[in-house]
UniProtKB/Swiss-Prot annotation:
Record-linked NCBIfam families: clpX (TIGR00382), PRK05342.1 (NF003745)
Residues annotated to bind ATP: 120-127
InterPro entries per record: AAA+_ATPase, ATP-dep_Clp_protease_ClpX, ATPase_AAA_core, Clp_ATPase_C, Clp_protease_ATP-bd_su_ClpX, ClpX_bact, P-loop_NTPase, Znf_CppX_C4
Identification of the protein by name: ATP-dependent Clp protease ATP-binding subunit ClpX
Family recorded in the similarity comment: Belongs to the ClpX chaperone family.
Record-annotated ClpX-type ZB domain positions: 1-53
Length: 423
């Protein structure tokens, strides 16, 4: 502001002239601000809890890097079995974040090693990834590969999976750039055919091609509200170089490809003859090679960007029983706590736990199906207990489980509900 028709330079905020203040600082379009107004602004910011002089800590400072042994020990508290998978994951995650924290100080460029997890439904793929992110203290997001399509077609762009990570980091881009993304159902975006086709495969090979850049590391532009990009939209830039991608899938049928290759390669006098029935899915996955994934429908460029392969075993009856009882947040412990909050004790007999595990095996849903079974078993009790203050303890046995898993199942038998003694 030039002044009030007197030719003097004044502060654009308080109107004082250059003679009345210690200093005037010029800005764009002929604007000025004096030192007194600057002090007032600083006081306002300080009162609102904004300190412009405070050094912001780097997002790297939040990363809790622990040794592979410590990582596996933490996984053991929450995930039952899968020891070899835990070791491989612990080493891979440790090396990834060691590389992130080292930055560009090394003469040797350390390449990112994304992870491919193979295992049947309910074997613990998602839980392993979630638990790793929690102990490392980085943002974590889950994406479903089946919703993705190539840019320009109906469905989600691959950049939308980055938006989920940004949201998990509360829009702190620096934190998001050190996060973990788990892409589930990755086996569902395979090529529809090994042969070259003239028709466009927008949800298969097209998605794999679109994922290549962000898996490897690139400066991506993400729509802040999701959906498709458009020219008038402000985009969020994010560097994916230090984001760890863990891709998981059941890969149904891959074991047949592996078996076929191994049977062919084992022909000869000195071959180790082994029938296909002796090689279960978990064992077959341990022998998976890049050419097996290519035959399954993943493109070679995609396989090259997920160099670490982790195979998970299908959970057997003993593992399911341990999952129900042993982890820190096991389902039985969770339901026991819920009942405690209502002042009621809860007990499961061994036969009841065995029956729940058997039902999960029958449904072939692995650990994921245990909660649905438990909900069906506990529903009537959880409905009744908050209103009935006379109940002091509930005992769940095999008959209780079987009765409540029937479509016409009635309430838990009265004999297994202990009532409080009359006062």
């Amino acid at each position: 502001m030039a002044g009030k028709n007197d030719g003097k330079i004044r502060c654009s905020f308080c109107g004082k002239t250059q003679d009345q203040v210690n200093r005037l600082i010029s800005g764009p379009n002929g604007a000025f601000i004096c030192d007194e107004c600057i002090d007032i602004c600083a006081e306002i910011l300080e009162e609102e809890g904004v300190d412009g002089h405070e050094d912001k800590s780097s997002a790297k400072d939040d990363i809790n890097l622990v040794t592979p042994e410590e990582l596996k020990a933490f996984l053991d508290d929450y995930v039952i079995g899968q020891d070899q998978a835990k070791k491989v994951l612990s080493v891979a995650v440790y090396n990834h974040y060691k590389r992130v924290l080292a930055g560009d100080t090394s003469d040797v460029e350390l390449q990112k090693s994304n992870i491919l997890m193979l295992g049947p439904t309910g074997s613990g793929k998602t839980l392993l990834a979630q638990t790793l992110a929690r102990v490392i203290n980085v943002p974590f997001a889950i994406a479903d590969a089946t919703t993705l399509t190539e840019a320009g077609y109906v469905g989600e762009d691959v950049e939308n999976i980055l938006l989920k990570l940004i949201q998990a980091a509360d829009y702190d881009i620096e934190r998001a750039e050190h996060g973990i993304i788990y892409i589930d159902e990755i086996d569902k975006i395979t090529k529809k055919s090994e042969n070259v086709s003239i028709t466009r495969d927008v949800s298969g090979e097209g998605v794999q091609q679109a994922l290549l850049k962000i898996l490897e590391g690139t400066e991506a532009s993400v729509p802040p509200q999701g959906g498709r990009k458009h020219p008038q939209q402000e985009l969020i830039p994010i560097d994916t170089t230090n984001i760890l991608f863990i891709c998981g899938g059941a890969f149904d049928g891959l074991e047949k490809i592996i078996d076929s290759r191994m049977d062919t390669s084992s022909i000869g006098f000195n071959s180790d003859v082994k029938s296909k029935t002796e090689l279960n899915v978990g064992e077959a996955f341990k022998h998976a090679l890049p050419q097996d994934f290519v035959k399954f429908g993943l493109i070679p460029e995609f396989i090259g960007r997920v160099p670490i392969t982790v195979s998970l075993e299908a959970l057997d009856r003993d593992a399911l029983i341990r999952i129900l009882k042993e982890p820190k947040n096991s389902l039985i412990k969770q339901y026991t706590k819920l009942f405690e909050l209502d002042g009621v004790g809860l007990e499961f007999t061994d036969d009841a736990v065995n029956a729940i595990a058997d039902k999960a095996l029958e449904r072939k849903t692995g650990a994921r199906g245990l909660r649905a079974i438990m909900e069906a078993v506990m529903l009537d009790l959880m409905y009744r207990i908050p209103s009935d203050k006379s109940i002091s303890k509930c005992v769940i046995d095999k008959d209780t489980v079987e009765e409540n898993l029937k479509l016409d199942g009635d309430c838990v038998p009265e004999a297994y509900i202990e009532e409080k003694a009359a006062s």
